[in-house]
C-alpha cells in the first residue's frame, strides 16, 4: 500500500501550480499536440500538418542565405559565447530601431528597443508588465492569437474580447471595443497583418484605433510579426506612426518574414514620444521582467544586424510570389468543398480563415469535432476556430508546396464526401414518405 506521508508521517506540503494548467488549456501548442494524438498510425497515410503555420518546413519556403551566413559568422567569431545584457546587446537594439525607423515619424533609438526570445517572449513580458492591478483587464481580438489568452490567464489579467468584422474586411468593431472597456482596462492587442484572418489594416482604420485608445486611456500592443508577409494590394502601415495619439508597444521578430520560427529572436519597441509609458512605470516594469527571464541567444543577437540590413529585396519578392500562388491554388480548391467557405481572400500571412457549415455534415457538431475526425480519418491536421476564439471556423495553413496543398485539399474533399448529408431525389423521397404512412396505418 502506498505511503502518502513523509518520513515523519505528515502530509507533503507541496502541490502543482494549477495556474499553469489553466493557461496551457488555451495554448495553441497543447491543442496541436492533442490533435496529433488522434492521428491513426495504421492509416497508411503520412500526416499532413500545415496548420502550425511553419512554411519553413517546405522546400519552397527556405530562408535567405544571408541570414544563414550571418548566424554562422556570429558563431565562428568568438564574440557570441558569453551572456548578453538583459535588454539585448546595443548593436542588435540599434539595428532593430533603424529597421523600424524608415516608416516612423518619431524615430526610435536603441534605448527604445528590447531584444526577446521571439515574439512569444515579448508577449509574455509585456503582459506581465501590465498585470500589476488585480482588477486590470486587457482587450483581445476575436479571432486572435491564443498565446495572448494563455499568458493573460497565467498573469491573472482579465480577458475581454472585441470582434473583427468579416463583412468589413475584418476591421475592428470599434463600438464593441469601447463597450468592452472600463476604468480597469490597461491595453488592447492589435494584430496587423492579421493572424488568422489575413487582412491588412488601412491607415484610416489604424488612426481610428489610435483615437479610441487615447479616449480609453490604454496602450496599444501592436503585433507586427507578419509585416514581411504581405502579398495583396494594401500596403502595411505600422501602428507606431500613431504613437503621438496613444502609446504603442510594437512586437516583432524575424520568424515569419525570414521563415525561421525556430531561431527565436524578436523584439519590443516602445513608441512613446510623449513619455506616457515611462511616466506610468511600464518601461521600468518591462526592464524588471527582462532581468527575470533568460536572454535570447547571443549568436542570434550578433547576427541580427546583418540579417535586417543585408537581406536582398529579391528574397522577399520570391517568397511573396510563392505565397500568392499558394493563395490562388488554395482558394480555388476550397470551392470544391461546399461545407467550407472563405469570405475574403487573404492579403497577408500564410493561412486561409474558413467558415465551416456543419449543417451540411453528418455526425459533426462543431469545428473541433471536424478537425479531430479529419486528422483521424484523412491524416490532415487543421486548427479549429474555437482555439482562436471563433466557433465553427477553421484555419488552414497554405505556406507549403503546391503538390502538398493539392494532396491536403484532395483529402479534405474525400472527408467531406464521406460525411456530407445526402439529399434524396424528390421522387424517392415521396415514395419513402408514402411507404412510411402505409406502414403506420
Model-predicted segments: where are they?
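Generic structural signal for small/hydrophobic residues in well-ordered secondary structure
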Residues: 50, 71, 96, 113, ...
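Conserved core of the PLP fold type I
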Residues: 72, 76-212, 228-242, 249, ...
